[in-house]
């Protein structure tokens, strides 16, 4: 057996695999634990390996032995790994492990390392190893390795795979369907990336995939691993990146999966208060245990390596780095504060090893606090993520847009406050699934006013997001302003698009997405100071916000003006950085987008009229509850109008 295994995994020995596993540095555990062919001969059977260090006995039971105890496994006491060769086992048979736990209880457990599971609600693992796949994404991957993503557009379409669309009989889409329909749709809409909510095996659809049982398997209801590989392959050939949510902090409490696997805390913390996640009805991983680290890091590498993912969004980072995040009792760390030292160290380790192997990957944190530096280099004291969701921006902006415009003048800080901290992290601006469920209402429904005004404000909200520094994310159905909340077990309300206003809203989102990709000032300077220049963030009376996004060249900039009231602002004056002529290139109130305007504002010629610290200014008309974007048409870049700001080339 050892010779065959060594051949399969290069020249690494079984003992080395075990040692690295116990040290927390085995990042390809999926090539060792779980089920693997004994040799290349299809008739030679499979070897099964599972970690259950405190079990009294483990049997592998399956279709190959009528689910009896005829195949007791052998324990390697040093590593805690049980193993057995089963010559009779064949591909696609079902199996589980019968674990005699430390207290003598016998329970059927699924294989934590399985790469395929029986379709839910059944929970058996499947005897199967993934076959080599013929990828055709070399050009895409080569470009990604050479690209600095901080200075390139990232606009993410967030998707819950099974509920994007449903068939006429009510059955939800699988990846075979999504390859045919989602990819051309995303390409047409102008997004750069698709981010999937968790795709790994999970027993409860209502968890949306955030309470996992199988960290190495595509959810059986979503299609086959090869179908997902086909999907990623096709995305890359269409210049679309693929990200997946990953949940390394907590897992499903289901008794037949990871929970107290050998009858003792195996994957979870020893301390029951730390193990139990009361708020989510789940269990927390012991992030300080070396074997758990090997398990989780191997899961990340499995998805990145085997499926050519372009990155991951790590779910619920706050729960991993703060001891007092959850409900219920908690104990301070050895320094007397609330930081989860093991969780912090694990996430730094995760980012370090993943970025070493895949420097081109996008690693994003869903994290809502402001007390820890999440993005940035580990050497600078950060946890090491590339990006962090800006939950503060999202909460403030949505509160503002739900507000009656009469009160907005006294709350303009809700949309301007983010200008004070936009460089504190590398941010993604998220309008995600979390904001359109559980009675929170859809984005469209959140907007103040009648239906016409709701569409107008949704266009303005999206314009503000796209013009604001940071990467972008929008949850599916937001692009056309679906009025109903998202339902995880039901396809999106595509029938909405029969309505002219929804269809025009979808068209606007597509135009805005393509505009973002084409306009370099919106991304080429990344987080540099020079990319953002605020013209006026203090116009409370008119409740109008104006700012500039700069590119590398002096002449490359966009002027953004947003009107948050239902009053059209005519002859509205703002300062401009250079003397000359400015032309309107986007107006959210155009008829093609669902507004009433049939033509753009005439070009604006600057005047030597001071505005704040600007020597030159222009006047224009800003539509009610709308936004306009201006671009220099013919300007004198040799002398800057502003007295206080010098934009460097």
UniProtKB/Swiss-Prot annotation:
Function: Catalyzes the formation of the alpha-1,6-glucosidic linkages in glycogen by scission of a 1,4-alpha-linked oligosaccharide from growing alpha-1,4-glucan chains and the subsequent attachment of the oligosaccharide to the alpha-1,6 position.
A single GO molecular function term of this UniProt record: cation binding
Disulfide bonds: none
Keyword Repeat: no
Pfam families xref list: Alpha-amylase (PF00128), Alpha-amylase_C (PF02806), CBM_48 (PF02922)
Subunit annotation: Monomer.
Protein's name in the database: 1,4-alpha-glucan branching enzyme GlgB
EC number in record: 2.4.1.18
Keywords from the UniProt entry: Carbohydrate metabolism, Glycogen biosynthesis, Glycogen metabolism, Glycosyltransferase, Transferase
Gene Ontology BP annotations: glycogen biosynthetic process
Species of origin: Ligilactobacillus salivarius (strain UCC118)
The organism's taxonomic lineage, starting at the top: Bacteria, Bacillati, Bacillota, Bacilli, Lactobacillales
Domain of life: Bacteria
Family listed: Belongs to the glycosyl hydrolase 13 family. GlgB subfamily.
Keyword tRNA-binding in record: no
